[in-house]
Design a protein with these regions (language model features):
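A short, well-structured edge-of-sheet supersecondary motif
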Residues: 1-15, 47-49, 114-117, 128, ...
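Active-site helix/loop module of the DD-peptidase/beta-lactamase fold
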Residues: 18, 23-27, 39-93, 129, ...
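Short amphipathic alpha-helical face segments that pack within enzyme cores
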Residues: 30-35, 144-152, 167
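Cytochrome P450
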Residues: 138-144
Length: 171
């Protein structure tokens, strides 16, 4: 659509206009993917590199299977983080990994307004300690890319993710 089409509010019969504002969700995922592709193009990132080579906290990942924890056959690769095949999961109550991520998320939210909010690095380390819900590369699950973003930032030596994204986007 190169102009405008449809209704902004069907009940009120209000049409979409050129300046209609929309909420956009999950936009850090494509931005992180573009940043990773730029780093790959510059020779600074290998998509098939183990994440643990960049973020050591991911070196000892475990996979939950039948209520027990196992060492996966292979590590999480950068490609897995971007393709959502890492085994990482959003907060939920059905799996051991999901419950662990729920606790991490609750702590991060509780500390948000404190003097010690959870840093991106700390969040990646805490997520790395959570069990995976499947072995890397064996399945797909919609999940965010904070670890991928943190790995990209770590690889470039940048400290602040927002600054890195702004530089990657040319702003």
């Amino acid at each position: 659509v190169y102009a405008q089409a449809g209704m902004a509010d069907r009940e009120a019969e209000k049409p979409i206009e050129r300046n209609t504002i929309f909420r956009l969700y999950s936009m850090t995922k494509p931005i992180t993917a573009v940043a990773a592709m730029i780093l790959m193009e510059r020779g600074m990132l290998d998509l098939y590199e183990p994440v643990a080579d960049i973020l050591p906290a991911f070196a000892h990942q475990k996979v939950e299977r039948d209520g027990k924890l196992y060492t996966p056959e292979r590590p999480i690769l950068m490609h897995d983080l971007l393709a959502m095949t890492s085994g990482l999961v959003y907060p939920e109550e059905q799996t051991m990994g999901g419950r662990a991520v729920t606790k991490v998320s609750e702590e991060a939210c509780a500390r948000l307004e404190s003097d010690h909010p959870v840093s991106t690095q700390e969040m990646a380390e805490k997520i790395a300690a959570c069990p995976l819900v499947f072995a890397p590369g064996t399945s797909w699950q919609y999940v965010g890319k904070p670890a991928a973003g943190n790995a990209a930032v770590d690889r470039t030596g940048r400290v602040y993710l927002c600054k890195f994204y702004a530089e990657m986007c040319g702003t």
